[in-house]
Amino acid sequence: MKKIVIVGGGIAGMGIANTLADKLKGKAEITVINKEDFYFAGPSRXIL
């Protein structure tokens, strides 16, 4: 089994982790390394 390590658990890191998990369907172990032990998705602001 392949092992994938993603450094950074922000919106991009979590996004690619979810995308890879969907595409690889258990064929790889995905680890996300982040300085925090949680992920907070706050509301986005409108771009004016």
Curated annotation (Swiss-Prot):
Pfam families the record matches: Trp_halogenase (PF04820)
Classification via InterPro entries: FAD/NAD-bd_sf (IPR036188), Flavin_halogenase (IPR006905), SQRD (IPR052541)
GO function terms (MF aspect): monooxygenase activity
Matching SUPFAM superfamilies: FAD/NAD(P)-binding domain (SSF51905)
Maturation and modification: The blue color is due to an unidentified non-fluorescent cofactor, covalently bound to it.
Summary of the function given for this chain in its UniProt record: Ambineela is a blue protein and has a pI of 8.7.
PANTHER family given in the database record: FAD-DEPENDENT PYRIDINE NUCLEOTIDE-DISULPHIDE OXIDOREDUCTASE, PTHR43755
Subunit and partners: Monomer.
Name of this protein: Ambineela
